[in-house]
Amino acid sequence: MLQKEKVLVLGLGEVGGSLYEVLVESGKFLVFALDLDINKMREAGAGIPEGRVDVMHVCIPCFNREEFVKSVLEYIEKFNPKITIINSTVPPGTTEELKEKSKHFIAHSPIRGVHKSREHMKWELRRWTKYIGGTDDNSAELASKHFRNLGLKVKVLRSSRETELA
C-alpha cells in the first residue's frame, strides 16, 4: 500500500482553511496545518507534522515581501518540503526569490474565486482551474501532480511571474 503524502498548510485563514478542508475531505493525504492563532488550529483539528513534509502550501498574507520571504524560508528549512506551493498573492518575482534563496522546488498557484465564506471558497477551489507557475519545470510538474491528485483541474503556465501577475 502506498504511503499518503504529508501535506502542510501554513495559515488557516479563509484561503488556507478552505484548502486544508478540501485536502482533508479528499482522504488522499496526511494533512497538517500551522497558524499563529491556536484557536484556528484547534477548530480545524490540525496537528503539527514531525520531520519532512512532501508538500507545503503557503497561505499567509504578504504585507511585506522581505518578511514574507524570511518567514517562508524558515518554514522550508524546518519542514524540508519536496515542493512548496505559494497560494498567497505576492509581488512578481517573490516565488523566484524563494527558489534562489532556498534551492528547493517552488511554484506559485493563485487562489481564484470570490472570498465570501469558507464553504464558498471550497466550492471555488474545486470549480476553477488551478493555474500553476513553476520556478522551473520540475517545480511545475510536482505542483500540478499534487493538484491533479487532489482532483482539481490544472493548467501549467510559463512561469511563476505569470501567475503572480494573475
Predicted segments, located by residue:
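Rossmann-like NAD(P)-binding element
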Residues: 47-83
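A short helix->loop->beta-strand "cap" motif at the edges of active sites that frequently abuts
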Residues: 28, 79-83, 103-104
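Segments forming oxygen-rich coordination pockets for charged ligands
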Residues: 161-166
